[in-house]
């Protein structure tokens, strides 16, 4: 079985648990996107996966490629773009306060595919 994912992978900036964005003076950095997350899970089961997307042609985009490849995800169909990689901010919930996501993806590489 082979599975391809088509979607945007973004830079995720998240707060520490219990901190609101307004209270934060730093963010934790990771990468995320629904399709990439599914492919990572499938690759753990030995399923061949490939990502179809576009990322910025800079160190962030190249780091995303390295990240995907570290999970044995085929990146043959990932294009490098002069547009930026999308970003999302994750305010990690705590107690009864749920998590909150703010997207910043206007004019991103994926939106310009």
Q: What function would you assign to each model-found segment?
A:
Residues 48-49, 84-86, 100:
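A common structural microfeature
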Residues 53-57, 79-82, 93, 107:
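Short glycine-rich, polar/acidic loop-and-turn segments at beta strand-coil junctions
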Residues 65-84:
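A glycine-rich helix N-cap at a beta->alpha junction
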Residues 92-113:
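Conserved phosphate-binding/catalytic loop of the ribokinase/pfkB sugar-kinase fold
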Residues 1-71, 96, 113:
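Glycine-rich phosphate/adenosyl-contacting loop at the front of the ribokinase-like
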Residues 87-91:
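Short beta-strand scaffold segments in enzyme catalytic cores
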Residues 6, 81, 102-105:
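Short beta-strand segments
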């Amino acid at each position: 079985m082979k599975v391809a994912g088509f979607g945007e992978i973004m830079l995720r900036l998240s707060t520490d648990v219990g901190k609101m964005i307004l209270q934060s003076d730093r963010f934790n950095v990771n990468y995320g996107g629904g399709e990439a997350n599914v492919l990572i899970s499938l690759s753990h089961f030995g399923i061949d996966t490939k990502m179809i997307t576009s990322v910025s042609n800079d160190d962030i985009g190249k780091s995303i490629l390295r990240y995907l490849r570290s999970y044995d995800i085929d990146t043959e169909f990932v294009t490098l773009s002069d547009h930026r990689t999308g970003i999302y901010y994750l305010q990690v919930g705590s107690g009864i306060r749920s998590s909150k996501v703010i997207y910043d993806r206007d004019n991103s590489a994926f939106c310009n595919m």
